Design a protein with these regions (language model features):
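Intrinsically disordered, low-structural-confidence terminal and linker regions
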Residues: 1-9
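Core alpha-helical transmembrane segments of integral membrane proteins
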Residues: 179, 183, 187-190, 196-202, ...
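Long, compositionally biased intrinsically disordered regions
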Residues: 373-617
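A charged, amphipathic alpha-helical module
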Residues: 166-179, 185
Length: 617
């Protein structure tokens, strides 16, 4: 706690000569080395604490002003060292301001009674009419949010998690609004009940009310012109600009939301990009993207997702209200004009075309194209495995993680082939083989859940799924050899079904174990819950090996993994990988033949494919 002293009579005289006034000068306390010369037309009410004002502040590039306070009314305010506060149209009330801040041309900044700073709000994601399934707070990440959405119907679990989160909020919440060190707030109208962490810049915001902005020196936040943000939390590295309107939202690390995007009761995590469109009750996991004015994300759970223009979802059957929702698993895309009627579940890395009206559940056929032609629905299983788009996506996502090393709360596992997706592939391959067995080889098409699968598509689907299986098994075996955990797994953890918890790939058994520990009171804080997610991720390769080892035995009909078997797996891996690259090359050539792809772009892509042989060993 800093020591303050009262003003001397001489200091009061200097201040009054500079047109400053205080309701009670005895309640204006200053730092030991305080000098009163850089204060002009300042009015003080209540308890005031002032630091030293010795340095200059950069207000624009190559333009500095001396620190001080000019043309402002302050009530119950603490100001740190070397701040410049000027042109406050209304007042600053009940705030603590850090060091080296620049606050200029604002209207009002105040903390009112009962301020929550956006923390502890219960919002309803996916089910727009729900009772609430995500509690907003500063340490929320995509895993915890997905976990809450999935299990908040379990009252005991909900009560336990809510209690842990409320304890964390109670321990960390300030008594009044705070502005961190190095913050710049200019040309902004209203900032109410908002915590702003260090090195944040707010320029031209219209209203920030009941918010927490988690900026930091190495991963700062920018809030731009016309932004209205209420009851929300914004994480490190974010940019919220150009008249965004946001209410009851959480924005995770390094997200960009811009160009008039509107959002309500939604969460956005890690590197998501939202522009022009709208989100309501949407769960946008890592790398979710929507660029277009006519796109609406509503009642859906997404990750590694790209919304084409005029993408739309309907969560309303016009009967019991807007209560329906669905999941588009990781890597899914919706083409321009796509429409999905909820509830729906789309398998990982699939692409949706047209108006999908019959509530598909296609998690068992991943990497598919789902197409609607009028009333007729088609599915092309495995088609996306061999596309240029998939190849580019899986290469670009790791490079586009813009989060600073110090602010990576959400866990992102970039593996496109994992026990989660490969488990779906294994199931999908069996479904296609059984359809062929039941329908025979001499038919033109097959039916699956009201979707038509052309015979040629079924045959290719089996082929592509098998290619992916062999690539996956060979890649995991290669890593096991290099990292020294080859051999029979020492634990059964990892066997069985896997899930994707918004970026974290984990066995269902580990999720179930965490649920039981929370309900039984074996987890003492919400940070312990988060640490469990990190611990599961740290053991991913170990759990993956246990699952993949059993897959290899089952696929090749083995009792154990011998040297001869490993050689065969490796040879199959190389052949499958080359077949995969050859199919992607064909896809690229087909697009190039359309005539508007520049030769240089095509040649660069083909060169990357040519170098894929370098990764075989």
């Amino acid at each position: 706690m800093r020591d303050y002293r009262k003003l001397t009579d001489e200091e009061i005289r200097v201040l009054e000569n500079n047109s400053c006034w205080a309701e009670d000068w005895n309640r204006v306390m200053v730092a030991e080395d305080f000098r009163p010369y850089n204060f002009h037309r300042v009015v003080f009410y209540g308890d005031i604490r002032l630091g030293v004002f010795e340095k200059t502040v950069e207000v624009a590039k190559d333009f500095t002003k001396h620190s001080g306070i000019n043309d402002a009314t302050l009530r119950n305010v603490t100001v740190g060292d070397n701040c410049l506060i000027e042109k406050v149209g209304n007042f600053i009330n009940n705030y603590t301001i850090g060091d080296d801040c620049y606050i200029s041309n604002i209207s009002t900044m105040e903390t009112t009674e009962g301020a929550s700073f956006g923390e502890g709000h219960l919002i309803s994601v996916l089910n727009e009419m729900g009772d609430g399934n995500v509690v907003l707070f500063h340490d929320l990440n995509s895993q915890l949010a997905a976990f809450m959405v999935k299990y908040f119907k379990d009252k005991q679990l909900k009560d336990s998690l809510t209690r842990l989160i409320n304890e964390e909020i109670r321990f960390t919440q300030p008594e009044r609004g705070t502005i961190g060190n190095g913050v710049k707030i200019i040309n902004s109208k209203e900032i109410t009940n908002t915590v702003v962490k260090e090195d944040c810049e707010i320029n031209g915001a219209a209203r920030l009310s009941d918010c927490t902005i988690l900026s930091s020196k190495d991963d700062s936040v920018y809030i731009g012109t016309g932004v209205i943000c209420e009851n929300s939390i914004i994480s490190n590295g974010c940019s919220i600009t150009n008249s965004v309107k946001m209410q009851d939202c959480f924005v995770g690390e390094a997200c960009q939301i811009t160009n008039g995007f509107t959002a309500e009761a939604s969460v956005f995590f890690a590197n998501s990009y939202m522009a022009n469109g709208e989100a309501c009750a949407a769960f946008c996991g890592p790398f979710s993207a929507s660029h277009h004015k006519s796109s609406l994300l509503i009642g859906g759970e997404f990750s590694f997702y790209n919304a084409g223009s005029n993408t739309n979802f309907s969560n309303h059957a016009y009967k019991m209200g807007p209560m329906h929702y669905g999941t588009l698993e990781r890597g899914t895309k919706t083409a321009s004009g796509a429409y999905v009627l909820m509830p729906a579940k789309i398998g990982s890395f699939s692409v949706c075309f047209g108006k999908l009206m019959n509530h598909p559940d296609m998690r068992c056929l991943p990497f598919a194209y789902l197409l609607a032609y009028g009333e007729t629905m088609y599915i092309v299983p495995g088609r996306n495995i061999t596309t240029v788009g998939l190849y580019r996506d899986i290469k670009k996502w790791p490079k586009r993680d813009k989060r600073a090393a110090s602010s990576r709360k959400s866990i992102i596992n970039f593996d496109w082939l994992s026990p989660f997706t490969v488990g779906e592939i294994v199931e999908g391959k069996k479904i296609l083989e059984n359809l062929r067995l039941a329908g025979g080889n001499n038919v033109s098409s097959y039916n699956f859940q009201e979707y038509i699968i052309n015979a040629s598509s079924l045959k290719k689907g089996i082929k592509y799924y098998d290619i992916a299986l062999r690539i996956y098994m060979g890649a995991v075996l290669k890593r096991a050899v290099k990292e020294g955990f080859l051999g029979k797994p020492t634990s059964d953890t990892g066997l069985g079904k896997w899930i994707d918890l918004s970026g974290l790939l984990l066995p269902v058994s580990e999720e179930e174990r965490l649920i039981e520990d929370i309900k039984n009171g074996n987890v003492e804080s919400i940070r312990d819950v988060l640490n469990r997610f990190y611990d599961i991720n740290d053991h991913y390769r170990e759990y993956q090996w246990a699952w993949t080892y059993q897959l290899m035995l089952d696929y090749y009909g083995l009792d154990e993994l011998t040297d001869q078997a490993m050689q065969r797996i490796r040879e199959d891996y190389v052949r499958a990988r080359r077949a995969w690259i050859a199919e992607i090359r064909k896809d690229a050539q087909k697009e190039f033949a359309m005539g508007d792809v520049e030769q240089e772009v095509f040649d660069d892509f083909i060169s990357k494919l040519d170098h894929e042989v370098d990764y075989e060993d």
